[in-house]
Regions:
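Short, well-ordered coil/turn residues at beta-beta hairpins
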Residues: 5, 125, 135, 164-165, ...
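Hydrophobic residues in well-ordered beta-strands that form the structural core
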Residues: 4, 27, 53-55, 187
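C-terminal helix-rich "cap/oligomerization" subdomain common to oxidoreductases
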Residues: 1-4, 46, 156, 236-277
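A short helix->loop->beta-strand "cap" motif at the edges of active sites that frequently abuts
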Residues: 21-23, 48-52, 159
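NAD(P)-dinucleotide binding in Rossmann-like oxidoreductases
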Residues: 142-144, 157-232, 247
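Beta-loop-alpha module in the N-terminal Rossmann-like domain of NAD(P)-dependent dehydrogenases
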Residues: 1-44
């Protein structure tokens, strides 16, 4: 088994090398710098069909997200109407060599590095989006990658998602609202190593079907332990041992979210022209 935890520039090359050497591969997100990177990986994956390839979208394994997924799939509150999300931190954190803030190393900024999780969750709860409008900027930190992405998207069913991915959120924030026909799900805060995103909570607010003055019915669930990393790796191991197909974080998921990210980048004509996307 090979675990790939490298800068975006090297991740696809290492993944391909692992598959060619007959290793099961777990690669942290993002899968590369651009769409071509993951497409190149998939070509090699198809040749090595017995090997397992999984990408690290660990947010899917947080309990608040798992519970929200169950509620949506149950249909008890009807269909999804829209999404509203904010995921942000106070800077594009520089690790060794500050590669995350350099386009030639990373391929993108806060959207590709952190916003990818929010986009993956929205895709996890719904399906692919075919209309995208965006404003992308690097006006604050002045790196050659984005520090803010303002996005509105629509899918074929008419469901709309609004998202702000930012590296100018001075108080770190994770918040995703999912509006259903009969209720609203609010995912607020997320457990992380930095412990800077607040308590992880899922608040369920039922739609008021009667008098406008009737008190809203709310249920709040708080989660104090993050087992997402363990669940993710346990699932990967189970799929290897029992020769099961990868369900969460497979190469199709990685390709879908990378295509969406580049739709977002290219939707801003100025950004597209500036970086020849």
């Amino acid at each position: 088994i090979l675990f790939v935890c490298l800068p975006n520039k090297y991740a696809p090359k290492a993944t391909i090398m692992g598959l060619k050497n007959h290793l099961h591969v777990f690669c942290e997100k993002p899968p590369g710098k651009n769409v071509k990177d993951i497409e190149d990986v998939i070509k090699v994956e198809k040749i090595n069909k017995k090997l397992k390839l999984k990408y690290g979208f660990n947010h899917r394994y947080h309990r608040s997200i798992e519970e929200a997924k169950k509620i949506i799939e149950s249909g008890k509150f009807g269909e999804i109407i829209n999404f509203r999300g904010v995921y942000g931190k106070s800077k594009i954190i520089p690790f060794t060599g500050e590669w995350r803030s350099k386009r030639r190393e990373s391929g993108g900024g806060i959207l590709l590095d952190q916003g990818i999780h929010m986009l993956d969750m929205i895709l996890y709860f719904s399906n692919e989006f075919n209309q995208v409008h965006s404003f992308i900027s690097n006006n604050f930190w002045h790196h050659d990658v984005e520090d803010n992405a303002y996005i509105i998207m629509k899918d074929k069913k008419g469901r709309v998602a609004m998202l702000h991915s930012t590296a100018t959120e001075w108080r770190h924030k994770f918040r995703l609202e999912i509006i259903l026909e009969k209720a609203q799900l609010e995912l607020s805060g997320i457990l992380s190593g930095s412990k800077s995103y607040g308590e992880e909570k899922l608040i369920i607010t039922k739609r008021n079907m009667g008098n406008i003055n009737t008190k809203l019915i709310e249920k709040s669930h708080k989660y104090t332990i993050d087992r997402s990393w363990k669940k993710e790796i346990d699932e990967f191991a189970e799929h290897i041992i029992n020769d099961k197909p990868i369900i969460n974080g497979n190469s199709k998921d990685a390709l879908c979210v990378m295509k969406l990210i580049y739709m977002i980048y290219k939707s801003d004509k100025g950004w597209k022209k500036k970086f020849n996307l």
